[in-house]
């Protein structure tokens, strides 16, 4: 077996490295810079029932230690994705597992998008972005309430019984463990953690926030220690597969998340400054494994 191969929720991956949702859209641009077949899987941007225009510009801002973004889930909607984006990936990368990231404004939206996303043959995982605001609860993110997380997970698994469903956890909670356990009770096949942290920057010239939305999700190196801590906490209480994300800029960063408890990793903000980031991290894994005396990536898997 190749030293980089591993298995997550029963799906074989040629490497443990994926892109993070929203950092490579549906793959066409990233494919100009790296061979997508190097990836363990490709994660599409979060897709909703209807097309979304997203927030007006500016939607991103570089900040100390990372990026702030408030794109507003801009996407063409599930029907377009099923008709055009996923077929393009299937035609050009037939052996590449696709992670279908989904989002919504209410639980019914999530369930319907998950059901439709799962019909695509090349979608091997469903990733549920539960950092979205719950309109019925005054805008509070779905992922902050264990009761909501458990119920939503159960409802999604009811319509997607034959493909792994991974819940992507928000770090914007007092305690992450109850949220992870709620997802497990609901039948989640795995977890993706962590999503971005809410932040803000103010332009001193204008006295206004730098992002049109005011606040935005903080990603990048600044959140890496938080991801390590939360993954470690959750690994202590569950054997669910974990895909780690948060400030992965190097092979050593990836290994740190895996030592904490992840079986695979996603690369997000690093792609903004370096379009070859995923390739570079994959190429650096074997030398880093040799340096720190790891035999293979599969030893990090919770599926022994």
From Swiss-Prot:
Binding-site residues, substrate: 45, 69-73, 129, 195-196
- GO molecular function terms attached to this record: dihydroorotate dehydrogenase (fumarate) activity
Keyword Transmembrane assigned:
no
Q: Which HAMAP family match?
A: DHO_dh_type1
Which Pfam family, giving just one, matches this sequence? DHO_dh
Q: Which residues bind FMN?
A: 21, 45-46, 129, 168, 194, 220, 246-247, 268-269
Listed A to Z, the keywords are:
Cytoplasm, Flavoprotein, FMN, Oxidoreductase, Pyrimidine biosynthesis
Can the keyword Cytoplasm be found in this entry's annotation? yes
What's a BP term from Gene Ontology annotated to this protein? Answer: 'de novo' pyrimidine nucleobase biosynthetic process
Q: What is this protein called?
A: Putative dihydroorotate dehydrogenase A (fumarate)
Q: Where in the cell is it found?
A: Cytoplasm
Task performed by this protein: Catalyzes the conversion of dihydroorotate to orotate with fumarate as the electron acceptor.
Q: Which GO terms describe its cellular component?
A: cytoplasm
């Amino acid at each position: 077996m190749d030293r980089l191969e591993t298995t997550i929720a029963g799906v074989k991956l040629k490497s443990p490295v994926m892109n993070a949702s929203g950092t490579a859209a549906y793959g066409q641009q990233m494919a100009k810079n790296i061979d997508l077949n190097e990836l363990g899987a490709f994660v599409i941007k979060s897709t909703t029932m209807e097309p979304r225009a997203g927030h007006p510009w500016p939607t991103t801002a570089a900040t100390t230690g990372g990026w702030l973004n408030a794109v507003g889930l801009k996407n063409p909607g599930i029907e377009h994705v099923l008709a055009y984006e996923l077929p393009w990936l299937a035609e050009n990368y037939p052996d590449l597992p696709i992670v279908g990231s989904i989002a919504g404004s209410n639980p019914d939206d999530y369930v319907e998008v998950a059901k439709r996303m799962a019909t695509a043959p090349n979608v091997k995982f469903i990733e549920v972005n539960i950092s979205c605001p719950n309109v019925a609860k005054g805008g509070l993110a779905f992922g902050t309430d264990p009761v909501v997380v458990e119920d939503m997970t159960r409802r999604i698994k009811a319509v997607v019984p034959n493909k792994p469903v991974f819940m992507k956890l928000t770090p914007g909670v007092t305690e992450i463990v109850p949220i992870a356990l709620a997802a497990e009770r609901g039948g989640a096949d795995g977890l993706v953690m962590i999503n971005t942290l809410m932040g803000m920057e103010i332009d001193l010239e204008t006295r206004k926030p730098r992002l049109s939305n005011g606040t935005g999700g903080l990603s990048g190196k600044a959140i890496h220690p938080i991801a390590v801590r939360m993954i470690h906490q959750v690994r202590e209480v569950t054997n669910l597969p974990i895909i780690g994300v948060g400030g992965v800029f190097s092979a050593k960063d990836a290994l740190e998340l895996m030592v904490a408890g992840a079986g695979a990793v996603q690369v997000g903000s690093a792609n903004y400054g370096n379009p070859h980031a995923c390739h570079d991290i994959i190429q650096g894994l074997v030398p880093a494994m040799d340096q720190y005396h790891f035999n293979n990536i599969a030893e990090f898997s919770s599926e022994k």
